[in-house]
Amino acid sequence: MPAHVMIIAGETSGDALGADLMQALRRRQSDVMVTGIGGPKMSGEGLASIFPMSEIALMGLKEILPRLPQLFKRVDEAVEHALATEPDVMVLIDSPEFNHRVAKRVKAKRPEAKIICYVAPHVW
């Protein structure tokens, strides 16, 4: 049975890192299954994103506040996907506000879940 990796990338730099990670995983195990959330680069590597990454790639209160209900809905969808598909490992790239909410809720329901924070955001 192929390994199942769920990757969540919430911004452009994370999408590029996620695509690189997908390539590296496939070099090691060609039949690895990758699900999750990503942008065009990860889609180019074969990811069918749960929803468009652009819906969580928001910066600053001015962008975030009016979209809070939608963001909470997207957290719910990511958690539901993780619980329904039971990936072998979840890899979270950037977007800590979103990703940590997902991770906390998944761990509450599946304490044995393996979750890796692949890259933390950088200060520019």
Predicted regions and their residues:
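Active-site and donor-binding regions of nucleotide-sugar-utilizing enzymes
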Residues: 3-124
